[in-house]
Amino acid sequence: MTAAVTANVVTLPAAEPAKAVRDTRPLRLITCGSVDDGKSTLIGRLLWDTKAVKEDQAATLQRDSTGKQNDLGLPDFALLLDGLQAEREQGITIDVAYRYFSTDNRSFIVADTPGHEQYTRNMATGASTADLAILLIDARLGILEQTRRHATIASLLGIKQFVLAVNKIDLTNYDRAGFEKIAHDFREFALSLGVKQITAIPMSALKGENVVYSGQAAMPWYNGPTLVETLELATVRSAQSVGFRLSVQRVSRPGESFRGYQGTVAGGSVKPGDSVMILPSGMVANVSKIVTFDLVRNAAVAGDAITLVLDRQVDVSRGDMIVAIDSQPQSGLAFDAQIVALQPEGIEPGKRYWLKSGSRRQRVQVQPIAQLELKTGAWAPAQALWMNAIGKVRLSFDEAAVFDPYDQNRSTGSFILIDPDSNNTIAGGMITGKRTDLGGIHKEGQRVLLSLPADLADQIMASELFASRRDETEVRRVTAAQAADIWANAASDI
């Protein structure tokens, strides 16, 4: 007879869902939008509610707000930001103001930028280092042209996280339908910019509703996060993937036995023994030593200010770039870029300007190609670009220029244009790609067929740059007649 065995069934507790890993690194953010949408008031309220305002500052704010108080009897929080005399007199923001605040979970660096059209260049400056953009919109007015301009500039500068802060919602009697229409319209516009990560929040910066504390008592229909809750969950821009980059700012020669190249590491890392290349010359050397103010370092990473010592005497000047030999930037005479025009005279077609990128300064001819239509998000052909226009241009250099695309490295992919006549900075720009001499955009794996006189080809093949990439090339020596036939057959494909 077989005995029955009763199995004990053990019920395991359900596994808890994996928790999202919170990014606790300091977050850099920018407030932008049209004039009088409440950017300075919002930051002032953030500082006030996160207890970032010291007692003496609070007393000064209460005193300076006398006679400026609103119907609620609240201080004028914007005064915490408007530091210039002209700003206080006009009640507007002109300069970029940086402020710091923190919560129990994270610290923040916020840039308050001007909304007026004539100060667009200051807004671009603030956006160039930000991880996230808070785009303010007056709930009564909806999306304006300057709103679209600021969103576009932020997107071009690589910001992919947006908070759509629909401010002054209290002045619309907390109109839910109006808020949802603004959020819908902006999401449609943002798709044309390639921006998909958008958090829309209805708020009253003056009253502090949905800023640090919930505004659900006034807006029971909104159950989303507050502004601070959203910021605490945002991510810092991911590290860019290019190799070592050092733009030489100064050649240090304190004595006959020492020669070092000073600058701030703009990408990647470096250590003694690494092979590097000097561009645009193409010379190769090894890193002998890395020196800082009072230390000899074992390595250096992006953001470090260093003096680099090489193992041999090479010709290096201010403006040259020292790069990892196995991860080189693009070098050439022609590049495509996107720019923001910053001066009333705009960009004249074919005019020669100074281009400054890092410590390098070169002559360049700028040819406008297209201008962004802010209302539609479409690009239209353009012969010139006037103040505040966002455009695509072609850059042509007399001597080889060296860049990374901006989306790969912000430091080595950005530049400003300087008018040689007035010395004004007339545009800021971002490199999108290299153009070959045949007019095509440089792409990974693309081949270029050139027909050169034999003596010129021999000079090119004798260079160190060519030698370092010899295994990537194919050389065929042919007669002039054969070259003409090859060219005729290939031209239609180039």
Curated annotation (Swiss-Prot):
Its EC number is 2.7.7.4. Residues 112-115 are annotated as: G3. InterPro entries: CysN_GTP-bd, CysN_II, CysN_NoDQ_III, G_TR_CS, GTP-eEF1A_C, P-loop_NTPase, SO4_adenylTrfase_lsu, T_Tr_GTP-bd_dom. Residues 167-170 are annotated as: G4. Pathway: Sulfur metabolism; hydrogen sulfide biosynthesis; sulfite from sulfate: step 1/3. Residues 33-40 are annotated as: G1. Residues 91-95 are annotated as: G2. One of its GO terms (molecular function) is GTP binding. Residues 204-206 are annotated as: G5. One of its GO terms (biological process) is sulfate assimilation. Belongs to the TRAFAC class translation factor GTPase superfamily. Classic translation factor GTPase family. CysN/NodQ subfamily. With CysD forms the ATP sulfurylase (ATPS) that catalyzes the adenylation of sulfate producing adenosine 5'-phosphosulfate (APS) and diphosphate, the first enzymatic step in sulfur assimilation pathway. APS synthesis involves the formation of a high-energy phosphoric-sulfuric acid anhydride bond driven by GTP hydrolysis by CysN coupled to ATP hydrolysis by CysD. Heterodimer composed of CysD, the smaller subunit, and CysN. This is Sulfate adenylyltransferase subunit 1. It comes from Rhizobium rhizogenes (strain K84 / ATCC BAA-868).
